[in-house]
A protein has these predicted regions:
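Charged, non-catalytic interaction/linker regions at domain boundaries
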Residues: 1-214, 218, 222, 230-234, ...
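Charge-rich, solvent-exposed alpha-helical interaction surfaces
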Residues: 70, 178-181, 251-255, 268-275, ...
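Positions within ordered alpha-helical repeat solenoids
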Residues: 222-225, 297
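Alpha-solenoid helical repeat scaffolds
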Residues: 225-229, 301
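Flexible secondary-structure boundary motifs
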Residues: 232-286, 327
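Histidine-centered, metal-coordinating catalytic motifs and their short helical/loop contexts
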Residues: 270-324
């Protein structure tokens, strides 16, 4: 018997998804990450319900109606959506030494699921169009006992929320790319912190917009910081390719002379931009400055409404440079 954590997230950026769609993003003996259309998602939901029939044999008429109403609501609300499905199973024999308090205070499933979610959402975001909303909405999370593939006991309740954001059709080629990226980044230390932070910015309805913005900003900040070891080499290499009287040469030379390799965040970003995105340095540099100013103003007490925090712009800028990094690593 396994103790299983099952999570489901609605893609905010996909509409009119094929209802029978099913792709494995990742799968091993105990962990599964899938993309599902509505019919496939509903199959899993109904199989879970049928597996619990013995437990629910004594349900009242009202309780049975509530279950039917929940299934009806799923069909009404989510019939055209796609879902990210995460299934993490741990054999009961590996958990039985824990007391109930030890197990449920911090279930070991959660870290495993978080790592899978981080890698999957970062990979998918990197492989979809930049104009598509990268956010997700968690619509369910539950712990179950499963034996021989059948759920026999439920430890938590199903939760459903609704949220609508701009979307696009699903392109299967994007998922082919996302699977390749997932394999490249999953469980690698250099990506773990970055993708973990970024993925937390993708669930604004659960984490609140402020927390999502902080997560997006921190993912960008940490990404830049982790590139520190490359910056000196990047900068010196760029100087060789430029004329002494160009603005870029003078700016980079000034940074190197004044900071002696100890760069401020803004300077680090500029140097990375010269390496990854030389044709649009000024545009990206100004965008980074603008986002950083809003972030600093907010945390120094300026009255800024949370809805005006540049969450999507920060996600977009991170996505852009994350893709540059992936391209350099996947060649």
């Amino acid at each position: 018997m396994d103790i299983v954590l099952i999570q489901a997230f609605k893609f905010d950026g996909i509409y009119d998804a094929p209802q029978n769609y099913e792709r494995d993003i990742y799968k091993d003996d105990y962990n599964i990450v899938k993309m599902l259309g509505f019919t496939k998602y509903l199959d899993i939901f109904e199989n879970k319900i049928s597996g619990l029939n013995d437990e629910r044999r004594n349900l009242t008429h009202i309780q049975k109606e509530r279950i039917e109403s929940e299934i009806h609501n799923l069909k009404v609300i989510y019939h055209s959506n796609a879902f990210l499905y995460i299934d993490v199973a741990i054999p009961y024999d590996q958990l039985k030494h824990l007391s109930s308090e030890q197990l449920w205070e911090k279930p070991p499933h959660l870290e495993l699921a978080s790592n899978l979610f981080s890698a999957a959402t970062s990979a998918i975001t990197a492989c979809r169009a930049s104009i598509v909303s990268p956010s997700y909405e968690k619509i369910s999370e539950g712990f179950y006992a499963r034996q021989n593939g059948v759920i026999i006991k439920e430890f938590s309740n199903y939760n459903i929320e609704q949220n609508d954001i701009s979307m696009m059709h699903l392109d299967d080629r994007e998922i082919d790319s996302a699977i390749a990226v997932f394999k490249h980044i999953y469980d690698k230390k250099e990506f773990k912190t970055i993708t973990s932070l970024f993925s937390q910015s993708l669930i604004p309805t659960e984490n609140a917009r402020l927390f999502s913005f902080i997560s997006a900003w921190r993912s960008l900040e940490v990404f830049i910081a982790k590139s520190q070891q490359d910056i000196q080499e990047i900068s010196l290499g760029r100087l060789k390719d430029k004329s002494d009287d160009t603005p870029d040469y003078k700016f980079i030379k000034k940074i190197l002379d004044v900071t002696d390799g100890k760069y401020h965040l803004l300077q680090r970003f500029y140097l990375l931009a010269t390496y990854y995105n030389e044709n649009n340095i000024e545009e990206d540099f100004n965008e980074f400055q603008s986002i950083q100013k809003v972030r600093n103003d907010y945390f120094h007490g300026t009255n800024i409404d949370q809805k005006d925090l540049p969450l999507e712009r920060t996600q977009k800028l991170f996505r852009k440079y994350f893709i540059f990094k992936l391209h350099s690593g996947l060649k």
